[in-house]
Swiss-Prot record:
It is an enzyme of class 3 (hydrolase). This is Cysteine protease ATG4B. Pfam families: ATG4_LIR, Peptidase_C54. One of its GO terms (cellular component) is endoplasmic reticulum.
Amino acid sequence: MDAATLTYDTLRFEYEDFPETKEPVWILGRKYSVFTEKEEILLDVTSRLWFTYRKNFPAIGGTGPTSDTGWGCMLRCGQMIFAQALVCRHLGRDWRWIKGKRQTDNYFSVLNAFIDKKDSYYSIHQIAQMGVGEGKSIGQWYGPNTVAQVLKKLATFDTWSSLAVHIAMDNTVVMEEIRRLCQSNFSCAGAAACPAVEADVLYNGYPEEAGVRDKLSLWKPLVLLIPLRLGLTEINEAYIETLKHCFMMPQSLGVIGGKPNSAHYFIGYVGEELIYLDPHTTQPAVEPSDSGCLPDESFHCQHPPCRMSIAELDPSIAVGFFCHTEEDFNDWCHQIKKLSLVRGALPMFELVERQPSHFSNPDVLNLTPDSSDADRLERFFDSEDEDFEILSL
């Protein structure tokens, strides 16, 4: 059998279970004990949406690739971290996927946003074609920063989720910019100023009620992505404790990055090992039914997740957080400030109230959906793609 087309059900026996350790297991802001909560750990992992290489999907751009094997791993990791944001947005962090159990319409709406077809909001087709505007030809490998930029642009079309996506540049998170972005949605004077919305109104096959309802809110749910370089050719060990703390925060969406020959979606850690979902398995493309439902088992990792030493992590990563409310954001800021006081933990980025004077135009990349990455982005992350190699499967 072709190794590239094996499913995880086939390979289940090859994956190690969690080590018997007193060290806590952290999964996207949740703390577990291996001894007493192993089933809960596995259920949490299984409930994350898992996107892998696919084959035999409609040709990208009509005449392009019908599979992303060998080049799409970072794109799939980008889908996974963004799917976690949509799960938190529409289903909640504590939602769980149970095999064989009928899921809600919102669940299928989230999943359909990533299906391999051209009209899905965050499909491989949309990411690859939007990437052309970022200087990436279809089939070219992306780094974590580039996929973050592309997903931000695609999110502007997702009126159902109505997200504010902020990409923090220059290792700096500016609180004032984020508040301005998240509060810019409040355009109605009050509920009476906005038209009534029927619950079954659809936009591109998705319920639109959530997006319209949020126009009555003072805060637009925030997806915060922070591209970082934590060393030159290998991760600086001074950042390791800080990175671990990111997985402990309830706002955590995880990390996209990898090691020199592959990209992974990191969802937690135990001891000195990162826990991740691996996209390097080629599965047949899935076609949704007319009702919007689809066979979904292949989108959930049903075995103990992969692990790797933190020291093996490539230094070019993107860290993600989701703040549903302004209170969530304020709490995140408080945690980041406390983290700067932890002994032996070197801050990975700076949190400031206002834009430093040496910055150029205020938040050009975050307030202008159709702007390009701009020179300063390329200046800092120019080498990110060179540190990864395409897998030959």
